[in-house]
Amino acid sequence: MNIAIIGSGIAGLTCAWRLAGHHQVTLFEAGATPGGHTATVDVATPQGTWAIDTGFIVYNDRTYPRFMGLLSELGIGGQKTQMSFSVHNPASGLEYNGHSLTSLFAQRRNLLKPAFWGLLSEIVRFNRLAKLALTEALDPGATLENFLARHRFSPFFARHYILPMGAAIWSSSLQEMRRFPLPLFLRFFEHHGLLDIRDRPQWYVVPGGSREYVRALLARLGDRLDLRLNAPVQQVDRHPTGVTLRLASGEAHFDQVIFACHSAQALAMLAAPTDSEREVLGDIGWQRNEVVLHSDPRWLPARQRAWASWNYRLSDGDCARACVTYNMNILQGLPADAPLFCVTLNPDAPVDDRYVWQRFVYEHPLFNPQSWSAQLRREEINGQQRSWYCGAYWYNGFHEDGVRSALDVVQGIAAAEDN
């Protein structure tokens, strides 16, 4: 068959990798660079040039089996990294990093604070109750806030631990985390070892930057894939005998189309979406997130002992977007003499231009009861009218989910052929 793939993120690339040997495949990318959220930047400094990741950064050996399988097929091994998490409250001055006892009490006065000891006690209690809840039937409509209220967790615990951690993971505000679907939240935390003090998965980065797997995949595909960059698809018309893609350069005709882009983008391209497509794709919301690559240490905790891989900065109120600074020196294992590299998501104040290397905008899916219901209706639209939908937003929003959703589509196309 002649198949069009729209979007060159992890989902689109996985579809291309699996289909290009058996079908005629054309991959359309609106931008100048393939990879989607896999975005590695070369930063030239007096100490040399450094490849720094700004989008997709880490994966682990427990919950990324499909992505690790893809890397293995490409001959790419992982580089071990440290995953740690800190919280800094500029209003109160509180900061801690849960990686070790030294970093946990980087702020020595916390040793004398009953509220801080209470926080540690509530973390243990939350982990225990979360595991217990997972052994029972979970209400699909329950939210994280319902769980916190039912078990009477303190506002201090919510604002200084569980909500910031969730907000950092899903790039959401604290308010959005309160509405987060409880089943999805608890299962994610369990699968990632976040309900345990020990026995956590080993995390990895791609050596040389995450773009290396994109380069390897495209090199291996070679001329089996027709990759078209700077080629935004304006409209998709579907008819009984095929699919027509309309671009600035003209029209292109295919037997099937795979939308490996965001749900909102896919819906906007459809010339005549069905009612189900409008409902399902339209119910998955997206949030715009600003990202700054810089070298300003003021976005990390004041005490270097508290510096973590992920550093959450609390703002007043719950509505502000998640402000997280990734310490790329820790995450990418840069040598001790390397300059400091930080990637800050949604800075809550201007980052000093003297330290800024580059700025980006990414969009991330919003997870709430509405999107949770939409995910469950995916099969209503997948494979209908020669159209297929994949992307990390169909599951938990991470690289593994992009691969998983793509493999769903590949299997669906194979099954449709057999019929």
Which ranges hold each PLM region?
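Mid-domain catalytic core of redox enzymes
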Residues: P232-E363
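Glycine-rich FAD pyrophosphate-binding loop
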Residues: A20-A44
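Helical element adjacent to the flavin cofactor pocket in flavoenzyme catalytic cores
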Residues: R187-L247, A252
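Conserved Rossmann-like nucleotide-cofactor binding loop
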Residues: A11, T33, A264
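N-terminal glycine-rich dinucleotide-binding loop that anchors FAD/FMN and/or NAD(P) in oxidoreductases
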Residues: V41-F67
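Mobile amphipathic helical/loop "lid" adjacent to a hydrophobic cofactor/ligand pocket
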Residues: D61-L182
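N-terminal Rossmann-like FAD-binding beta1-loop-alpha1 element of flavoenzymes
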Residues: N2-L27
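Conserved flavin/dinucleotide-binding core of flavoenzymes
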Residues: D42, H99-S100, C319-N419
